[in-house]
């Protein structure tokens, strides 16, 4: 059984309310907490089935919709757009804010983090900026390429995301 709750918290941008979800197991001892960082054009609710399966194993799961994603997208906002300025670090700081909330709620339970696709890159940045804050990390759907390939790939991904955001938001 799962106790699912939704919550909001203020982004590190100081203006956007971020939507989050918390899946807590019922009737099973809590063994760990997993914080999920979703990919581009995704939202945290996509991980519902996965979270419920982990709950059966005693793992609490939590995550939030990053800036410009899911229910964190302000009315009239641009999908998959983090905002102006150094927003990559803002999103990483948002991950840390949720981490702190989870640590406060579960102080004696190992806290782990998982990032998928874009979330894997956010997670990698998080691990560099906030070392020692998690017991384990799962990095999936990620990559490593030479700088030139990454620069070109990021430019292409940004262009594709800009076009796709005009015509489709993932379900």
Regions found by a protein language model. Name each.
Residues 1-25:
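N-terminal cap/lid segment of alpha/beta-hydrolase-fold proteins
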Residues 39-42:
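Active-site glycine-rich loops that stabilize anionic/oxyanionic intermediates
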Residues 51-77:
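Conserved alpha/beta-hydrolase
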Residues 83-103:
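Alpha/beta-hydrolase active-site loop
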Residues 106-116:
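Alpha/beta-hydrolase fold nucleophile elbow
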Residues 115-119, 123:
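Gly/Ala-rich beta-loop-alpha elbow adjacent to hydrolase catalytic centers
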Residues 138-147:
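Active-site nucleophile loop of the alpha/beta-hydrolase fold
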Residues 165-171:
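Residue-level detector of conserved catalytic or cofactor/ligand-binding positions
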């Amino acid at each position: 059984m799962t106790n699912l709750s939704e919550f909001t918290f203020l982004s590190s941008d100081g203006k956007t309310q971020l939507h989050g979800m918390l899946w807590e197991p019922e009737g099973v001892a809590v063994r760990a907490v997993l914080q999920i960082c979703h990919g581009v054009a995704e939202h945290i609710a996509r991980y519902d089935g996965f979270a419920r399966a982990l709950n059966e194993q005693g793992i609490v799961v939590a995550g939030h919709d990053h800036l410009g994603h899911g229910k964190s997208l302000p009315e009239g906002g641009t999908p998959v757009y983090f905002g102006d300025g150094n927003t990559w670090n803002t999103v990483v700081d948002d991950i840390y804010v949720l981490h702190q909330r989870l640590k406060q709620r579960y102080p004696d339970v190992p806290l782990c983090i998982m990032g998928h696709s874009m979330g894997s890159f956010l997670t990698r940045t998080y691990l560099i900026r906030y070392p020692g804050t998690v017991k384990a990390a799962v990095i999936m759907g990620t990559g490593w390429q030479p700088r030139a390939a990454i620069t070109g790939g990021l430019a292409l991904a940004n262009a594709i995301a800009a076009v796709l955001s005009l015509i489709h938001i993932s379900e």
